[in-house]
Amino acid sequence: MTSALWPDVALHVVSGKGGAGKTTIAAALAMALAREGRRTLLMEVEGRQGIAQLFDTAPLPYQERRVAVAPGGGEVWALAVDPQEALLDYLNLYYNLRSAGAALRKLGAIDFATTIAPGLRDVLLTGKACELVRRAEKPGAQTYDAIVLDAPPTGRIAKFLNVTGELSGLAHSGPIRRHADLVMGVIASRQTAVHLVTLLEEMPVQETIDAVHELHDHRLPVGGVFVNMVRPALFDPYQLERLDSGEVSVDEVVESLRAARVPGRAKQTAAILLEEAHEHARRMRLENRERARIDDLGLPIFAMPMLAEGVDLGGLYELARLMREEGLR
């Protein structure tokens, strides 16, 4: 089992709007699943080397490499998938043609094939993840308890995963089509869960909702929603109501400052504090409204806090700990 919420899932696909922190959440998820001596593999497919930056390590090659040890002795490995190398892998795995593939690369055919046909590129990238899932069936192979794929953003996630549909214009039959069908057999199964990362802002939430509907339309398995960078609420409902009604005045804040013996110009400070309080209240109302829209999806939700010190390896450990506390096991 990889988690109590998704007991049959071997492949966790993580997507999100740009800037929502999907790579951070993918890395923390890999850490959370690498518990009690388990091994997870964290994969990226966009060529950004975001994983290497998070783990403060050298750029990842097209080779599985350990990047962290999880609490309890688990391990997190990482892999940056290159479409050209994945095509060479495909030629070698199914046709024993790696040497021929190397010759094709020299002629520029490999680059041409992976650039001119985006459907082929996606089936190669997703195919590598699915090959690693199926590797568990091979005796003696290095296997993982869970694979976490840092996938493209929400605007492209359904097309990226719907490899048979996107490849239909390129190949209706033949080996590439059979390979796509094999890949789809993993992606559309209970072995896979697609998780979405969002912020409590209107556009990221709308993209998340649209992505969930699109994934459902393609019968792709949706996992949970990770609400990232959540700020602590400074006011309770009663205090929010007082701010909204204008009941809290500058004079009241001045009295509080003087009672607390805060030095400086009390009235000027009170005006600034009250303005900031109204801004925070506005932000809280926005976040509450967007959170309600996420709740309406009826999916498991994980609220991840904004880290005051930024995201580093220590921050990943903290996010992983919070994920486990919220039900990921």
Put a short name on every predicted segment.
Residues 1-6, 188, 192, 202-329:
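C-terminal lobe/tail of nucleotide-utilizing enzymes
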Residues 6, 33-36, 70-74, 137-142, ...:
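Conserved catalytic network of the ASCE P-loop NTPase/AAA+ motor domain
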Residues 7-12:
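Pre-Walker A (Motif I) flank of P-loop NTPase domains
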Residues 64-105:
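A conserved catalytic-core segment of Leloir-type glycosyltransferases
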